[in-house]
Amino acid sequence: MKITVIGAGNVGATASLRIAEKQLAKEVVLIDIVEGIPQGKALDMYESGPVALFDTCIYGSNDYKDSENSDIVLITAGLARKPGMTREDLLMKNTAIIKEVTEQVMRYSKNPIIIMVSNPLDVMTYVAHTISGLAKERVIGMAGVLDTARFRSFIAEELNVSMQDINAFVLGGHGDSMVPIVKYTSIAGIPITELLPKEKIDAIVERTRNGGIEIVNHLKTGSAYYAPAASAVEMIEAIVKDRKRILPCTTMLNGQFGIDGVFCGVPVKLGKNGIEQILEINLSEYELEALQKSAALVEENCNSLQAVLS
């Protein structure tokens, strides 16, 4: 198993180390355009092997040729939004980056599974799918796993229970339009509505929507990377081990939930072939409407890129 991670920033480097520590691949390649950064970080990780007890070969490179014949490619490259930069500016700049990255990936790997982490997540997943020509089941966005992890952690904190006992789904887009599904949220099988009043649940939902911003406000410079990296690696592990995990991931819908031809976060079954099934669960009228509104925002942004991608 060969896994390539594009982008040697905090998310990419942290994910690379977790992949190695879990021994999910024989070979991990960390690629970045900045000379020396991927090489230095990868060497540092590799030298931790005897202590962390892994034998994975990790190396860094500035050359996409080193990604040749990758089974899985994790894309974390892209710019963060800077002061004075509009969302449209960020969208266009990162579209150009992801277009170039995807072209290079496909130049050297015939049929990889691509996992997208770069923002705006849902749109960048669409870009990678459009440019790669891969089957939609093999281009997957990491959003719902992270948003769900935040939702679960906040519930566990409020109830003072183990995070492992929290079951939940956060669907829709990665951002203000995400849709935490309270109906399917439970604690060791007990519906959350039996343990928390509506106002507490609503507050947790709102905190989840602002989870990324909360971290940015603390850090002042930079953004979250431990939880995003862990979420991406959970997806990779499900694929590598063919675990058939049911996880909320961004995928292209073809009529499910009344959404067609748009990438949106929904429950899927993840296995060795990528997305093996989309689970069209029953949603309340409000939840379905919120999910469709979220998808409409993604579609609007994708439509604005047609000239760039053609």
Curated annotation (Swiss-Prot):
UniProt EC number: 1.1.1.37
Keyword NAD part of the UniProt annotation: yes
Residue numbers binding substrate: R81, R87, N119, R150
Alphabetized UniProt keyword annotations: NAD, Oxidoreductase, Tricarboxylic acid cycle
Chain residues that bind NAD(+): G7, A8, G9, N10, V11, G12, D32, N94, V117, S118, N119
InterPro entries referenced in this protein's UniProt entry, alphabetically: L-lactate/malate_DH, Lactate/malate_DH_C, Lactate/malate_DH_N, Lactate_DH/Glyco_Ohase_4_C, Malate_DH_type3, NAD(P)-bd_dom_sf
Gene Ontology BP term (one): tricarboxylic acid cycle
One example GO MF annotation: L-lactate dehydrogenase activity
Disulfide pattern: none
Active site per the UniProt annotation: H174 (proton acceptor)
Pfam families reported in the protein's UniProt record: Ldh_1_C, Ldh_1_N
UniProt-listed Gene3D superfamilies: Lactate dehydrogenase/glycoside hydrolase, family 4, C-terminal (3.90.110.10), NAD(P)-binding Rossmann-like Domain (3.40.50.720)
Catalytic activity: (S)-malate + NAD(+) = oxaloacetate + NADH + H(+)
Cited PANTHER family: L-2-HYDROXYCARBOXYLATE DEHYDROGENASE (NAD(P)(+)), L-LACTATE DEHYDROGENASE
Function: Catalyzes the reversible oxidation of malate to oxaloacetate.
Protein family: Belongs to the LDH/MDH superfamily. MDH type 3 family.
Entry protein name: Malate dehydrogenase
Annotated organism of origin: Chlorobium limicola (strain DSM 245 / NBRC 103803 / 6330)
Source organism phylogeny: Bacteria, Pseudomonadati, Chlorobiota, Chlorobiia, Chlorobiales
